[in-house]
Curated annotation (Swiss-Prot):
InterPro entries: EMC3/TMCO1, TMCO1. Residues 135-151 dip into the membrane without crossing it. The chain crosses the membrane at residues 7-27, 88-108. Its main location: endoplasmic reticulum. SMART domains: DUF106 (SM01415). Belongs to the TMCO1 family. Keywords: Calcium, Calcium channel, Calcium transport, Coiled coil, Endoplasmic reticulum, Ion channel, Ion transport, Membrane, Transmembrane, Transmembrane helix, Transport. It comes from the Eukaryota. One of its GO terms (molecular function) is calcium channel activity. This is Calcium load-activated calcium channel homolog. Homodimer and homotetramer. It comes from Caenorhabditis elegans. It is found in: Endoplasmic reticulum membrane.
Length: 186
Protein backbone atom coordinates (compact mmCIF):
# COMPACT_ATOMS: atom_id res chain seq x y z
CA UNK A 1 0.00 0.00 0.00
CA UNK A 2 2.83 2.43 0.79
CA UNK A 3 4.41 1.78 -2.60
CA UNK A 4 1.11 2.53 -4.33
CA UNK A 5 0.73 5.76 -2.34
CA UNK A 6 4.22 6.92 -3.25
CA UNK A 7 3.65 6.01 -6.89
CA UNK A 8 0.38 7.98 -6.94
CA UNK A 9 2.10 11.00 -5.37
CA UNK A 10 4.84 10.75 -8.00
CA UNK A 11 2.23 10.49 -10.77
CA UNK A 12 0.37 13.53 -9.37
CA UNK A 13 3.60 15.51 -9.15
CA UNK A 14 4.61 14.49 -12.68
CA UNK A 15 1.25 15.37 -14.21
CA UNK A 16 1.12 18.69 -12.34
CA UNK A 17 4.63 19.52 -13.52
CA UNK A 18 3.74 18.55 -17.09
CA UNK A 19 0.54 20.60 -16.92
CA UNK A 20 2.35 23.68 -15.66
CA UNK A 21 5.03 23.20 -18.31
CA UNK A 22 2.44 23.03 -21.08
CA UNK A 23 0.63 26.03 -19.62
CA UNK A 24 3.89 27.95 -19.53
CA UNK A 25 4.54 27.07 -23.19
CA UNK A 26 1.05 28.00 -24.34
CA UNK A 27 0.18 30.88 -22.01
CA UNK A 28 2.68 32.34 -19.57
CA UNK A 29 5.53 32.99 -21.98
CA UNK A 30 3.40 34.73 -24.62
CA UNK A 31 3.70 38.50 -25.00
CA UNK A 32 -0.07 38.94 -24.98
CA UNK A 33 -0.39 37.29 -21.56
CA UNK A 34 2.55 39.25 -20.17
CA UNK A 35 0.92 42.51 -21.30
CA UNK A 36 -2.40 41.49 -19.75
CA UNK A 37 -0.71 40.49 -16.48
CA UNK A 38 1.26 43.75 -16.27
CA UNK A 39 -1.91 45.71 -17.03
CA UNK A 40 -3.79 43.74 -14.38
CA UNK A 41 -1.09 44.37 -11.77
CA UNK A 42 -1.00 48.07 -12.60
CA UNK A 43 -4.79 48.45 -12.44
CA UNK A 44 -5.00 46.46 -9.20
CA UNK A 45 -2.37 48.59 -7.47
CA UNK A 46 -3.97 51.78 -8.78
CA UNK A 47 -7.40 50.72 -7.53
CA UNK A 48 -6.09 49.68 -4.11
CA UNK A 49 -4.27 53.01 -3.78
CA UNK A 50 -7.40 54.97 -4.73
CA UNK A 51 -9.52 53.00 -2.28
CA UNK A 52 -7.08 53.73 0.53
CA UNK A 53 -6.92 57.42 -0.36
CA UNK A 54 -10.67 57.84 -0.61
CA UNK A 55 -11.68 55.65 2.32
CA UNK A 56 -15.39 55.85 3.15
CA UNK A 57 -16.70 58.83 1.26
CA UNK A 58 -20.19 59.84 0.23
CA UNK A 59 -19.12 61.66 -2.95
CA UNK A 60 -20.97 60.02 -5.83
CA UNK A 61 -18.44 61.13 -8.47
CA UNK A 62 -15.59 59.42 -6.65
CA UNK A 63 -17.68 56.28 -6.18
CA UNK A 64 -18.50 56.22 -9.90
CA UNK A 65 -14.82 56.58 -10.79
CA UNK A 66 -13.96 53.69 -8.48
CA UNK A 67 -16.73 51.59 -10.01
CA UNK A 68 -15.40 52.33 -13.51
CA UNK A 69 -11.90 51.32 -12.42
CA UNK A 70 -13.29 48.10 -10.97
CA UNK A 71 -15.13 47.38 -14.22
CA UNK A 72 -11.92 47.91 -16.22
CA UNK A 73 -10.10 45.59 -13.84
CA UNK A 74 -12.80 42.95 -14.23
CA UNK A 75 -12.61 43.26 -18.03
CA UNK A 76 -8.84 42.74 -17.96
CA UNK A 77 -9.29 39.77 -15.63
CA UNK A 78 -11.89 38.32 -17.99
CA UNK A 79 -9.48 38.70 -20.93
CA UNK A 80 -6.76 36.89 -18.97
CA UNK A 81 -9.16 34.11 -18.04
CA UNK A 82 -10.29 33.64 -21.64
CA UNK A 83 -6.70 33.53 -22.82
CA UNK A 84 -5.83 30.88 -20.23
CA UNK A 85 -9.01 28.87 -20.82
CA UNK A 86 -8.03 27.89 -24.34
CA UNK A 87 -4.91 26.09 -23.17
CA UNK A 88 -6.65 24.68 -20.09
CA UNK A 89 -9.21 23.00 -22.32
CA UNK A 90 -6.48 21.19 -24.28
CA UNK A 91 -4.66 20.22 -21.08
CA UNK A 92 -7.92 18.97 -19.56
CA UNK A 93 -8.53 16.64 -22.50
CA UNK A 94 -5.00 15.25 -22.33
CA UNK A 95 -5.17 14.68 -18.57
CA UNK A 96 -8.57 13.00 -18.82
CA UNK A 97 -7.00 10.43 -21.12
CA UNK A 98 -4.06 10.01 -18.71
CA UNK A 99 -6.42 9.68 -15.76
CA UNK A 100 -8.34 6.85 -17.38
CA UNK A 101 -5.07 5.08 -18.18
CA UNK A 102 -3.80 5.35 -14.61
CA UNK A 103 -7.23 4.43 -13.26
CA UNK A 104 -7.19 1.18 -15.24
CA UNK A 105 -3.77 0.31 -13.77
CA UNK A 106 -5.03 0.68 -10.19
CA UNK A 107 -8.55 -0.65 -10.79
CA UNK A 108 -9.89 -2.65 -7.85
CA UNK A 109 -6.80 -2.06 -5.68
CA UNK A 110 -6.94 -0.46 -2.27
CA UNK A 111 -4.14 2.09 -2.32
CA UNK A 112 -4.61 3.55 1.17
CA UNK A 113 -6.70 3.39 4.34
CA UNK A 114 -8.55 6.55 5.25
CA UNK A 115 -8.32 7.61 8.91
CA UNK A 116 -11.99 8.66 8.79
CA UNK A 117 -15.30 7.43 7.50
CA UNK A 118 -16.11 9.62 4.45
CA UNK A 119 -19.45 11.37 4.21
CA UNK A 120 -22.03 10.10 1.73
CA UNK A 121 -21.33 12.06 -1.42
CA UNK A 122 -17.55 11.55 -1.11
CA UNK A 123 -17.89 7.76 -0.69
CA UNK A 124 -18.60 7.37 -4.40
CA UNK A 125 -15.22 8.88 -5.15
CA UNK A 126 -13.17 7.47 -2.29
CA UNK A 127 -14.45 3.90 -2.79
CA UNK A 128 -14.75 3.95 -6.60
CA UNK A 129 -14.07 0.59 -8.32
CA UNK A 130 -13.29 -1.14 -5.01
CA UNK A 131 -14.80 -4.41 -3.90
CA UNK A 132 -16.03 -4.66 -0.32
CA UNK A 133 -18.02 -2.66 2.16
CA UNK A 134 -15.20 -1.01 4.14
CA UNK A 135 -15.64 2.67 3.29
CA UNK A 136 -12.26 3.55 4.80
CA UNK A 137 -10.59 1.84 1.84
CA UNK A 138 -9.24 4.46 -0.55
CA UNK A 139 -9.24 4.16 -4.32
CA UNK A 140 -6.68 5.55 -6.76
CA UNK A 141 -8.92 8.31 -8.05
CA UNK A 142 -9.56 9.84 -4.60
CA UNK A 143 -5.90 9.89 -3.58
CA UNK A 144 -4.84 11.14 -7.01
CA UNK A 145 -7.31 14.04 -6.94
CA UNK A 146 -6.24 15.07 -3.43
CA UNK A 147 -2.56 14.90 -4.35
CA UNK A 148 -3.02 16.73 -7.64
CA UNK A 149 -4.96 19.57 -6.05
CA UNK A 150 -2.32 20.02 -3.36
CA UNK A 151 0.73 19.60 -5.57
CA UNK A 152 -0.53 21.80 -8.41
CA UNK A 153 -1.48 24.69 -6.14
CA UNK A 154 1.88 24.63 -4.37
CA UNK A 155 3.75 24.17 -7.64
CA UNK A 156 2.06 27.28 -9.06
CA UNK A 157 3.18 29.26 -6.01
CA UNK A 158 6.75 27.95 -6.27
CA UNK A 159 6.99 28.68 -10.00
CA UNK A 160 5.39 32.10 -9.60
CA UNK A 161 2.31 31.36 -11.72
CA UNK A 162 -0.21 31.90 -8.92
CA UNK A 163 -1.94 35.29 -8.94
CA UNK A 164 -0.71 37.90 -6.50
CA UNK A 165 -2.71 38.45 -3.32
CA UNK A 166 -3.99 41.79 -4.55
CA UNK A 167 -5.12 40.28 -7.84
CA UNK A 168 -6.71 37.31 -6.10
CA UNK A 169 -8.59 39.70 -3.84
CA UNK A 170 -9.97 41.54 -6.88
CA UNK A 171 -11.08 38.43 -8.73
CA UNK A 172 -14.75 37.89 -8.27
CA UNK A 173 -15.88 34.80 -6.42
CA UNK A 174 -19.44 33.88 -5.53
CA UNK A 175 -18.29 33.07 -1.99
CA UNK A 176 -16.21 36.19 -1.44
CA UNK A 177 -17.73 38.89 0.74
CA UNK A 178 -18.52 42.22 -0.91
CA UNK A 179 -15.69 44.75 -0.76
CA UNK A 180 -17.59 47.12 1.51
CA UNK A 181 -17.90 44.52 4.25
CA UNK A 182 -15.17 43.09 6.43
CA UNK A 183 -12.53 45.69 5.54
CA UNK A 184 -11.24 45.35 9.08
CA UNK A 185 -9.93 41.86 8.27
CA UNK A 186 -7.50 43.05 5.60
Amino acid sequence: MLGDCLLIIAIAFGTALAGEGITWLLVYRSDHYKRLKADMDKKTKKLEKKKQEVGDTNDKNIKRKLEREEERLKATNRDMSMFKMKSMFAIGLAFTALLSTFNSIFEGRVVAKLPFYPIGFIQGLSHRNLIGEDMTDCSFIFLYILCTMTVRQNLQKILGFAPSRAMARQQSSPWAPPNSQMNYLR
